[in-house]
UniProtKB/Swiss-Prot annotation:
GO terms for cellular component: endoplasmic reticulum lumen. The keyword Endoplasmic reticulum applies. The active site is at C74 (nucleophile), C77 (nucleophile), C421 (nucleophile), C424 (nucleophile). PROSITE patterns: ER_TARGET, THIOREDOXIN_1, THIOREDOXIN_2. The record marks R485 as: Lowers pKa of C-terminal Cys of second active site. GO terms for biological process: platelet aggregation. Its EC number is 5.3.4.1. Highly expressed in pancreas. This is Protein disulfide-isomerase A2. Glycosylated. It comes from Mus musculus (Mouse). The keyword Isomerase applies. Glycans are attached at N130, N287, N518. Disulfide bonds join C74-C77, C421-C424.
Amino acid sequence: MDKQLLPVLLLLLGVSGSWGQGEEPGGPSEVLPEEPTGEEVPKEDGILVLNHRTLSLALQEHSALMVEFYAPWCGHCKELAPEYSKAAALLAAESAVVTLAKVDGPAEPELTKEFEVVGYPTLKFFQNGNRTNPEEYAGPKTAEGIAEWLRRRVGPSATHLEDEEGVQALMAKWDMVVIGFFQDLQGKDMATFLALAKDALDMTFGFTDQPQLFEKFGLTKDTVVLFKKFDEGRADFPVDKETGLDLGDLSRFLVIHSMHLVTEFNSQTSPKIFAAKILNHLLLFVNQTLAQHRELLTDFREAAPPFRGQVLFVMVDVAADNSHVLNYFGLKAEEAPTLRLINVETTKKYAPTGVIAITAASVAAFCQAVLHGEIKHYLLSQEIPPDWDQGPVKTLVSKNFEQVAFDETKNVFVKFYAPWCSHCKEMAPAWEALAEKYKDREDIVIAELDATANELEAFSVLGYPTLKFFPAGPDRKVIDYKSTRDLETFSKFLDSGGHLPKEEPKEPAASAPEAQANSTLGPKEEL
């Protein structure tokens, strides 16, 4: 499915590497032949190959067993395969008590039903032979990510620190270390801390109950401290005595404070940018090849601390491969240096009023003005083509959309498309034929709008193609068209004033609108 660069994930959407949804399975799979009980379980690239009989044996033999349910035809499974094998090799080299295995899902329907496998690949982790409550893997699709996730389940997820030497050694080894200072290591707060440590794979965790370490770091109560070798150097999260340690609050705190005050946007940082779940992103567009542009980063960073957790400061290098970001904001590289702010929830974009010098004061003032509602958001629009109304299909842009779509004397049928969308290209002949058929009707307008280059105040377009009908009249009524995209059905829809008979078949899923890229989940092929 083609996907558009979405506002919410505008900065190249951080596909974070957890498992999401994708293609529907249905390809053939060869059923494994019967194997005699007791026969040695085969291996492929360090991975046990299991079926409904040998899975039971493997669970008895291996106290920690991860099983990948895959399909031979599944593209995502094929992409995962080398990483999965590398993870097995990493753990074997460490003599870890974890075994990795796989099951051909289509060949083993009883197992996929038992373990509620709804897509491929699905990874389940079994401990101590318990087949009733396996834990599903939702971490990165990388060898190190899989291996580290397993390490933190078969071994400690955090290091017990008993003296200053241990703390300093841990801090020296890593750029970021999270240390929980707890007076009671058997309490609920400690359990919450360890639960978080199991899944926060990009951080290293330690804990202590030693009074001298509380004193050393100026603490008088239970506190989780993030030590880092950049920016402020340290961030404290005191434990609330009344409510205790909240897993969600601590997780958000660590994500926010593990971010640099200014994050350069690239494919490596984009997952973390969106994982921070900070709704406002302030972007500084600069050309990193120019010294005078690089110097602006000092002031940009100086403005950031008061907005930590509220506004994420991001630098976009216009000299790098970031044309998609520039296009999204309607900018050209030569307009740098410049600022833009986007709310990734509403997708509203803001620009400074007039040309401003980029200083710490002006950056802070711009942020405050947007947050206080003193600056109106802007909409992207192409210029109105001189011949926009000359052909059977009328060309709309943001600047003429309201005037045409809500003309009280016209019934207007609009296709919102993306130039790269395959479904849009497939339906183009039918749309042209529809316009040709009704070109002599004064009361009907067939139009199209490139929704990647034109934004509308009235609504957002979330998939392509999106078809909307604007019937004549003063009510500004909008009817979504969700049926078959062919000339016959389009004509019935128009002739009935925007209605279709109830028995009219709906558009099959294979031709559903192509979604914009607004998911942070990685792919999984559905059953």
